[in-house]
């Protein structure tokens, strides 16, 4: 049921060699041109506004040039609004989910980004490093603080006993709702297994809360007779991915402690596609992807699991992954091959690492409680803030109000563009004249 542990020698070797890819490249924030879906119609107007519609006529994307605003309507009913501001910051909001204000800044001549998230009245910060991969500008997560080497070693290696832990969310509405999909391990052989359940449960709770806020949570489904859809085998693959990420963060922490900067090419998805091993991604936000067999949309949501198949080609802006688990008929089916943009994959990895770091915070703070083992003395030191986090621009004091206002502005923005779309029919391409016949010598 539980994965074999990666040998200690590999952990030490990987820590020493982790940042040798040499792939780093900076990226200034710029508005990406979204790829056009092969089955969608795209109507671009004279003033730069545009509307993209699905094959059934429903709007998927609206771009308002004068407002510098993009609105995306997901298949599952979610709406994401992104606004770009003159100072190169951006605001991103999603119905019922955490929104953020992102501001760029420079540290040691490199591009960094500070996101201030607002969720259920809480304010928290995350940090990112700019990086180009296959010509796509990515924002790669970098922790705002690192633990001691002793803590990462403890988090990586197994416990000396099986730990039975009772989660506080048993009986909560979200857990009842997703009982058909997820069940925690019956016991834990080490921190990475506990963190696996922490990551999945955190993502599912966020999805449920967003559904309740939008009035679209749906009825609870019965647990299948053969067990939850998220199988132990798939969870074990995620467990192994979490071990890799603990390994990764330990290497980053060593560089930070020595006054060096990490390489975003080693910390982001470039590293994942550089080796020959399959890797798994956890979907961290609602996402529409392309079913490669049908070229139609299908939806993914928090807690769905994807696996890499092959690395993208040098000119590819998306990668092919296989769906290992999803939540029923409204989403991409299990074993479906889907095309996912590199930017979306990087955001999935960012979400996993952010949630993983949050889980490590809880492990350290709750050591010795509810069955969790006590930490060794070498693992009890508080995380040390990074130099780049200390120099980040402060949170926007008006950001909470701006996030709320953006949802209202998006309503007006969409209305402006769709009204113009109706008044300005798309001009069909000019008919080409048939080529003159070629005179051949007699």
Locations of the language-model features?
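Residue-level recognition of short, solvent-exposed, well-ordered loop/turn junctions
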Residues: 276, 301-304
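SH3/SH3-like (including bacterial SH3b) beta-barrel domains
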Residues: 291-302, 310
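Low-complexity segments
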Residues: 32, 36-42, 46, 52-236
């Amino acid at each position: 049921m539980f994965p074999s542990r990666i040998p200690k020698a590999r952990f030490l070797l990987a820590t020493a060699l982790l940042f040798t890819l040499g792939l780093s490249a900076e990226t200034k924030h710029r508005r990406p041109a979204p790829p056009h879906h092969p089955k969608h119609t795209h109507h671009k107007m004279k003033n730069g506004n545009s509307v993209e519609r699905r094959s059934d006529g429903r709007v998927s994307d609206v771009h308002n040039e004068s407002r510098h605003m993009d609105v995306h309507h997901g298949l599952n009913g979610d709406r994401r609004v992104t606004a770009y501001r003159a100072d190169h910051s951006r605001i991103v909001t999603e119905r019922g989910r955490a929104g953020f204000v992102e501001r760029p800044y420079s540290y040691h001549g490199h591009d960094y980004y500070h996101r201030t998230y607002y969720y259920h009245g809480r304010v928290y910060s995350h940090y990112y490093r700019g990086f180009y991969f296959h010509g796509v500008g990515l924002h790669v997560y970098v922790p705002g603080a690192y633990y001691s080497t002793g803590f990462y070693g403890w988090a990586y290696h197994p416990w000396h006993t099986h730990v039975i832990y009772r989660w506080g969310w048993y009986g909560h509405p979200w857990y009842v709702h997703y009982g058909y999909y997820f069940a925690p391990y019956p016991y834990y052989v080490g921190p990475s297994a506990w963190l696996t359940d922490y990551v999945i449960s955190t993502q599912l709770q966020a999805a449920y809360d967003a559904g309740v806020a939008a009035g679209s949570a749906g009825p609870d489904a019965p647990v299948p007779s053969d067990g939850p859809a998220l199988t132990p085998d798939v969870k074990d693959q995620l467990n192994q991915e979490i071990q890799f990420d603990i390994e990764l963060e330990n290497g980053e922490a060593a560089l930070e402690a020595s006054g060096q900067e990490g390489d975003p090419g080693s910390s982001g998805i470039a590293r994942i596609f550089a080796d020959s091993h399959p890797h798994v991604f956890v979907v961290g936000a609602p996402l529409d992807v392309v079913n490669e067999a049908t070229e139609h949309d299908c939806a993914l949501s928090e807690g769905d699991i994807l696996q890499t198949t092959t690395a993208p080609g040098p000119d590819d802006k998306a990668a092919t992954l296989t769906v290992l688990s999803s939540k029923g008929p409204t989403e991409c089916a299990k074993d479906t091959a889907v095309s996912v943009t590199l930017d979306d994959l990087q955001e999935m990895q960012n979400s996993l690492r952010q949630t993983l770091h949050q889980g490590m915070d809880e492990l350290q703070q709750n050591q010795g409680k509810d069955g969790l083992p006590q930490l060794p003395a070498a693992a009890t030191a508080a995380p040390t803030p990074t130099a780049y986090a200390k120099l980040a621009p402060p949170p926007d004091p008006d950001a909470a109000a701006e996030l709320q206002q953006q949802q209202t502005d998006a309503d007006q923005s969409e209305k402006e563009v769709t009204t113009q779309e109706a008044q300005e029919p798309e001009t069909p391409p000019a008919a080409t004249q048939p080529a003159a016949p070629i005179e051949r010598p007699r």
